[in-house]
Amino acid sequence: MSTPTLPNLSQLHGIQNQSLQQQQQQQPQQQQQPQQQQQQQQPQQTMQQPIQNLHQQAPQMQQPQYNLHTTLPPPLMNPNGLGLMGHNMMGGGNNGNNSGNNNGQPQMHGTNLNGLSLAIQNQSSLPQPINNNNNNNNNNSNINNNNNNSNNNNNNNNSNLGINSSPTQSSANSADKRSRGRPRKNPPSEPKDTSGPKRKRGRPPKMDEEGNPQPKPVPQPGSNKKRGRPKKPKDENESDYNNTSFSDSNTDGTPKKRGRPPKAKGDSPSASPTHNTLGNGILNSNNNNNNNNNNSNINNINNNNNNNSNNNNNSSNNNNNNNNSTNNNTNNNNNNTNNNTNNNNNNINNNNNNTNNNNNNANNQNTNNNNMGNNSNNNNNPNNNNHQNNNNNNTSNNSNTTTATTTAPGGNNLTNSLNNAGNLGNLGRVSGLHSSDPNNPNAQKSFPDSTNTMDFQPNFSFFH
């Protein structure tokens, strides 16, 4: 298989800037008249001329027809890693925060989904970005809502201390309520016949030898058993009990102490330590709400019950994406795929990912670790079934796009170099290859650095 020729970096950068400006100018016309725009014949244009329609012009740029199942996507990439690298990912806002156009109309025709394909527009042959944007909004809202539901339910229970717990359903009609206790007997319609012998209750009386009941013995005076406390013997020196006079003073004149002693005069004791008037529940709810806000801004996956730990993990992942991009290729690839799944929502199966992420925090961490291992295996073996399964969980076509193997001129695996370049954030800068590859004549050795760099998170997900 022949390696696709990669255009010059400066030419790609110029073509992109011109094509993007014209796309923004022609966007209202293309939305109003999509059929006429597609039916117009575009003239043959060279590399230096602006491209009017990327769909019709891309095959004319001396590029073979790409089959996403067997080859890599077209190398029409963002040359400097800037520009569209986070703008308008399938109609969303920056970094897929859903702050942009959420009605399914891409602001830039859905271009540059993950820094790889600039020629994906809203066509009937492709999955509609309207549905994807709706899934995007619903999924991001589901992430936050599930987070809010799980955390806020806990917060309500903590803060309100069961006040918001569902009350027992009581009917307005008291007759519908269940009667408690033994039901009352209805009064008899006829009076009872009490002429017969009464029912004998209690212990039967003792019988004598002949079977007659013995009469109860009459207690004799002096023969009763003495009960209670025995009488205190009188003291000879003490007067009669009945004649004793009670006084509030002792014999020495001091008052008798009875009951609780009076409070000590002087400085009053310090008040009890003031408790938190907000209560632990409301404080927890504030913490959780802050964590929810952080999660919504970061748009990370682990928006789960343990928000504090997840925020720390997600912030560390973002630091890995931004700073440690060189040493964390597989880690960044994992984070980028998962984060782009939730942020960009280019994927169809986002609902499953969101439910898994919302319900199983520990499982998400495990799957992230598995994805890290599988992605590292994919760099070694692009035909890894585990990586295909993981990509199928993210998008239905990930396995078709990332399992392509093409040998670069230097003998390097172009898929591995693409993955590594995407993880390094230099996919557009090196035009799909490592800048350190000495065997690649198209690899640029030096690139103009810009102060407006953005976090680049490729996902390698394409629609057929």
Curated annotation (Swiss-Prot):
Q: Return any one Pfam family short name.
A: AT_hook
| Listed Low complexity bias regions | 16-65, 78-88, 130-160, 276-428
- Give the residue ranges for region: Disordered: 1-112, 125-464
Q: Which residues bind DNA?
A: 177-189, 198-210, 224-236, 255-267
Q: Which GO terms describe its biological process?
A: regulation of DNA-templated transcription
Q: Which Gene Ontology terms of cellular component type are present? A: chromatin; nucleus
The UniProt keywords, alphabetically, are: DNA-binding, Repeat
One GO molecular-function annotation for this sequence?
A: DNA binding
Give the Polar residues compositional bias ranges. 1-15, 161-174, 240-253, 433-464
InterPro entries cross-referenced by the UniProt entry:
AT_hook_DNA-bd_motif, HMGA
The further comment given in this record reads: Several proteins derive from AAC-rich mRNA, which, due to a frameshift also have ACA and CAA codons and thus are Asn-, Thr- or Gln-rich.
**What is this protein called in UniProt?**
AAC-rich mRNA clone AAC11 protein
Organism this protein belongs to: Dictyostelium discoideum
